[in-house]
């Protein structure tokens, strides 16, 4: 995995965090690694939640520098809602990437398969996924849902799992 180039703005903090000296800040989520960060904005820049900003090595238009990594509990209610929306957008935009991850997931140990970590996936569904994977790799979320007979949407399960990982609720990481 390379360096992240883009991020989505989750919330704008005109006065930064209470424990931060930076005046204008914004909470962002990287589009690739899904890391949450607090960034200082350039002078006279105001950003809106949902805006995709460049944070790579070259000239940045909105972001001055990265202040620190943050956890979802540092976000306001609006920031948390925006995080859920942005994760859904990222999962939708990167369908090929996440289906490829599902096609490659293996066992964690003798008793636990990585697929079991996805919300809504139990032992029977894991067996069905493994069986279908041997026939042919999954090509899309729709293909996965149809072939496995998954009652909920796999994209939603991926979103939920990403949120669990960001909240630090599990020691095993699949997507973050």
Please name every model-derived segment.
Residues 1-93:
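Structure-specific DNA junction-binding interface
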Residues 4, 13, 117-119, 165:
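Generic detector of intrinsically disordered, low-complexity, polar/charged segments
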Residues 126-129:
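Conserved hydrophobic/aromatic packing and binding residues within compact polymer-binding modules
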